[in-house]
Amino acid sequence: MTTIRVLGSAAGGGFPQWNCNCRNCDGVRRGTVRATPRTQSSIAVCGDGPEAILVNASPDILQQLRQTPALQPARAARDTAIAAVLLMDAQIDHVTGLLMLREHRRALPLYATASVLEDLAGAFPLTRILSHYCGLQCHALPCDGMAFSVPPLDGVALTAVPLQSKAPPYSPRRHAPQPGDNIGLRIEDRHSGRSAFYAPGLGQVDDHVFAQLRRADVVLVDGTFWRDDEMQALGFSTRSAADMGHLALSGPGGMIEVLDRLPARRKILIHINNTNPVLAEDSPERAELARHGIELAYDGMEIAL
């Protein structure tokens, strides 16, 4: 059976964010807001054996590993269940955890699109840096709809789905995006046939992506912001959610409306920004999610396919 373990469910900065005193962050620190702290988003895809694919390497990876005993099977003096790392994009909050894995005993298998590998070899040269430590064994992901497997998890079929989103701010392609800067991931159990679609950074839902969402038994998608102008209204940024490559949850054409059109048995939001009112468990926004049958991912959540 294929299981998805949510290691981290917050957007970049985590929740509470280290330098933020918005209502959510200040309230969770003081105990005046009923909410659960969350680390920065990452999942582990696990098969029948102990090995797992780490999908995105969060800056919080060490804390996440400590909180997930299954990823430390202790079969040898030095051991890990992480068989490989797969990246959805080259965003800072999805790749810097690779630096924390530098003690890996041999070259760490890394799966990413050609454009992500290009950013990690140039603008943010993690591959060069890690060549002085464990090293990376890089594999370019196909973006043509072909399914692939990551050894030794041969019972899990993966498909990279290019998304309309943005390359990281540091990328020379930030304002000239290309397919592969950001992907969604179809995760299918080859035995049961059940599948999930994972997309923590989803700026637009075109017909191709919607078709992937409709096929999935479980969708685990971008829940970063409640409103498109959320950061602007709080005075934290001049950019909208759309400017940052995220589809807001509320409003016409928002993620809630998209999810309402899907037959999936589970609809789950991940990559939740610290400002999002859904984090407060007794908020009207959280209640609205419940009315629509939408769940909020949390660190430690397990999803069986």
Curated annotation (Swiss-Prot):
Task: Sum up the protein's function in the record's words.
Answer: May be involved in the transport of PQQ or its precursor to the periplasm.
As for family, the record states:
Belongs to the PqqB family.
Q: In which pathway does it act?
A: Cofactor biosynthesis; pyrroloquinoline quinone biosynthesis
For this UniProt record, the keywords arranged alphabetically read as follows: PQQ biosynthesis, Transport
**NCBIfam families tied to this protein:** PQQ_syn_pqqB
Which InterPro entries does this one have?
A: Metallo-B-lactamas (IPR001279), PQQ_synth_PqqB (IPR011842), RibonucZ/Hydroxyglut_hydro (IPR036866)
Cited Gene3D superfamilies? Ribonuclease Z/Hydroxyacylglutathione hydrolase-like (3.60.15.10)
A GO biological process of this protein is: pyrroloquinoline quinone biosynthetic process
Do the record's keywords include Transport? yes
Question: What's the protein called, per UniProt?
Answer: Coenzyme PQQ synthesis protein B
